[in-house]
């Protein structure tokens, strides 16, 4: 994508977030009025006729025929100039200048949000590119375009292409940037464990400011780590990480969310959790997984609480979390039924009894299950052979 000073988020991805909020069911109408004005101003200043037409068709924006026609005319004029530069480069200059002229046209299509023509022109530019590093840059432009449209099929294919390019060479700076792109892809497709691993690997080398600021990166790193790391790893890699500590306090509720969980301050955790929920709900990458993530966090915190007890009263647990007995009873019933918690409720006594399997028992049960599966496969195979 074009624009965006070094070290700042691409303007198009800021626009993408505004478009997400503009169509979000929970954003108040008064805020949407301001968002609509900001979106229209951005489209007008960047001459984004193709995007404007798409948003009109989906009833996000209203049609202003004169604006649309003026943007179309400006697009045609600029594309004519770019084609003239390509022709001049092909006639009078070298391969490097030809490539740059084609890339300029690709970036213009990205700027005006003409996705299909941008991809076509990026492919053409890639064909005129020799250096692995420059080929990687074309992939990064494609990834930014794909994240703008939330086209995860294109993201996946582009990441695979980048990894193949790295087999031919490539520098560490670009390899580290790719980890963040892949981490964002994994988080956006609900692979939180891999996302956390990739984000944690990138903390000390983060330079991917074009897709989000460093604070947002830390926000995602903490969120994905909390539901995927054990306590020891969480302490080593997140709670005590200097890079995280430097910005943790700048992100509302995040410090309380992380530290109260680790320090078993459950009432404070639930208070911070409510604040975090709002931020997750208004994040374009996390919103589709909002309910899933909220369940996973509660599974982690309830499991951690119960880990310390063989039995505990429901009332004591409710008090620890600062909620009513009825609430915690309903919560636990759902989580136990879903197989998320290893305990049972004695309704008469109002007591929770844990029955979590130890590591040896878990391994034993898994071995039996795998053995039964193997035996069934052998029996099916023997019947086929007998026939």
Curated annotation (Swiss-Prot):
Recorded coiled-coil stretches: 65-101
Post-translational modification N-acetylmethionine, affected residues: 1
Tissue/organ expression: Ubiquitous with highest expression in flowers.
Key words, A-Z: Acetylation, Coiled coil, Proteasome
Pfam family, one: PCI
Transmembrane segments: none
InterPro entries to which the protein is assigned, alphabetical: PCI_dom (IPR000717), Rpn7/CSN1 (IPR019585), Rpn7_N (IPR045135), RPN7_PSMD6_C (IPR049549), WH_DNA-bd_sf (IPR036390)
Domain PCI: 191-359
GO cellular component, one term: cytosol
Biological process according to GO: protein catabolic process
Subunit annotation: Component of the 19S regulatory particle (RP/PA700) lid subcomplex of the 26S proteasome. The 26S proteasome is composed of a core protease (CP), known as the 20S proteasome, capped at one or both ends by the 19S regulatory particle (RP/PA700). The RP/PA700 complex is composed of at least 17 different subunits in two subcomplexes, the base and the lid, which form the portions proximal and distal to the 20S proteolytic core, respectively.
Function: Acts as a regulatory subunit of the 26S proteasome which is involved in the ATP-dependent degradation of ubiquitinated proteins.
Family (UniProt): Belongs to the proteasome subunit S10 family.
Protein name, UniProt field: 26S proteasome non-ATPase regulatory subunit 6 homolog
Species per Swiss-Prot/TrEMBL record: Arabidopsis thaliana
Gene name of the encoded protein: RPN7
């Amino acid at each position: 994508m074009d624009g965006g000073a070094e070290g700042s988020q691409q303007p198009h991805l800021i626009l993408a977030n505004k478009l997400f909020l503009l169509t979000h069911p929970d954003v108040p109408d008064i805020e949407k009025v301001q968002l609509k004005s900001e979106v229209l101003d951005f489209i007008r200043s960047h001459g984004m006729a193709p995007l404007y037409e798409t948003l009109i068709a989906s009833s996000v924006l209203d049609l202003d025929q004169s604006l649309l026609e003026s943007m179309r005319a400006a697009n045609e004029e600029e594309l004519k100039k770019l084609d003239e530069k390509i022709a001049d480069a092909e006639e009078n200059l070298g391969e490097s200048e030809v490539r740059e002229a084609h890339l300029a046209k690709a970036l213009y299509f990205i700027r005006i949000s003409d996705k299909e023509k941008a991809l076509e022109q990026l492919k053409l530019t890639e064909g005129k590119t020799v250096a692995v590093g420059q080929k990687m840059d074309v992939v990064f432009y494609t990834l930014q375009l794909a994240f703008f449209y939330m086209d995860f099929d294109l993201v996946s294919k582009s990441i695979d292409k980048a990894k193949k390019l790295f087999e031919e060479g490539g520098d560490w700076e670009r390899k580290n940037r790719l980890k963040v792109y892949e981490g964002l892809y994994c988080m956006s497709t609900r692979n939180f464990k891999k996302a956390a691993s990739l984000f944690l690997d990138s903390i000390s080398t983060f330079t991917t400011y074009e897709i989000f600021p460093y604070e947002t990166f830390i926000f995602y790193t903490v969120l994905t780590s909390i539901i995927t790391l054990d306590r020891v790893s969480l302490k080593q890699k997140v709670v005590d990480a200097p890079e995280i500590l430097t910005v943790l306090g700048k992100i509302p509720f995040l410090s309380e969310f992380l530290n109260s969980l680790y320090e078993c301050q459950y009432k404070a955790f639930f208070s911070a959790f409510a604040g975090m929920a709002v931020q997750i709900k208004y994040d374009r990458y996390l919103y589709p997984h909002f309910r899933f993530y909220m369940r996973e966090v509660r599974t982690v915190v309830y499991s951690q609480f119960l880990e310390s007890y063989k039995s505990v009263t429901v009332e004591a647990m409710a008090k620890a979390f600062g909620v009513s007995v009825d609430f915690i009873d309903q919560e636990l019933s759902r989580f136990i039924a879903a197989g998320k918690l290893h305990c049972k409720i004695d309704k008469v006594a109002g007591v929770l009894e844990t029955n979590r399997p130890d590591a040896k028992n878990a391994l034993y049960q898994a071995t039996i299950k795998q053995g039964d599966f193997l035996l069934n496969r052998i029996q099916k195979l023997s019947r086929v052979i007998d026939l």
